Regions:
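Cell-envelope/glycan interface and biosynthesis
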Residues: 1-140
C-alpha cells in the first residue's frame, strides 16, 4: 500500500495504535481453548479458528458472558463497534480497565508520537483525533 493514510487504516483493522493497546492496561487477555489445539499447530487468533477448533469454547464463553457469569470479563471488539475487526478471543476485565480508560490521555500519546521515529508519523500526528474516534474510544466501555 503506497498511501500512508490507507496503510495506517489497514493496519488498524487488526492491530492497535502504538501505545493504545488495551493489553497494555494489564486488564485484557487473548484466550483460547488449549485442549483443542492440535499438536504442532500455531494459534493465529483468527475468525476461522473461532468458528472451527475453538467454536465449542467460544459458544460456551458467549453463554457465560450473556448470562452475567463472566466475573467482569467482557468482549470489547464486537461487530458494529468501531472499525477494528471483531476479536471474540479478546477479553477485557472491565472493573479494572475502566480505571485505565479514565486515565488515557490522547494528547500525551500525540506527544510521544512527535518525539518518536515511527512509521507513518505524519498521518498519526495529523489524524490522531479522528483515528481515536474509530479505533480507540469505541472500545472504552
Amino acid at each position: 500500500i503506497d498511501d500512508p493514510e490507507e496503510l495506517v487504516k489497514t493496519i488498524l483493522i487488526w492491530s492497535a495504535l502504538p501505545g493504545a493497546s488495551r493489553h497494555h492496561f494489564g486488564t485484557d487477555i487473548d484466550i483460547v481453548d488449549a485442549s483443542s489445539i492440535p499438536e504442532g499447530y500455531e494459534v493465529q487468533l483468527t475468525p476461522e479458528e473461532c468458528n472451527g477448533m475453538f467454536k465449542p469454547f467460544h459458544d460456551w464463553l458467549t453463554r457465560e458472558i450473556e448470562s452475567g457469569n463472566s466475573f467482569g470479563f467482557e468482549r470489547v471488539f464486537i461487530p458494529g463497534r468501531g472499525k477494528i475487526q471483531p476479536e471474540p478471543w479478546h477479553l477485557s476485565y472491565l472493573p479494572a480497565s475502566r480505571i485505565f480508560q479514565k486515565e488515557f490521555n490522547l494528547q500525551l500519546l500525540k506527544g510521544l508520537y512527535s518525539e518518536t521515529d515511527i512509521a507513518c508519523k505524519e498521518v498519526l500526528l495529523d489524524q490522531l483525533d479522528d483515528l481515536a474516534k474509530d479505533y480507540i474510544f469505541p472500545y472504552f466501555l
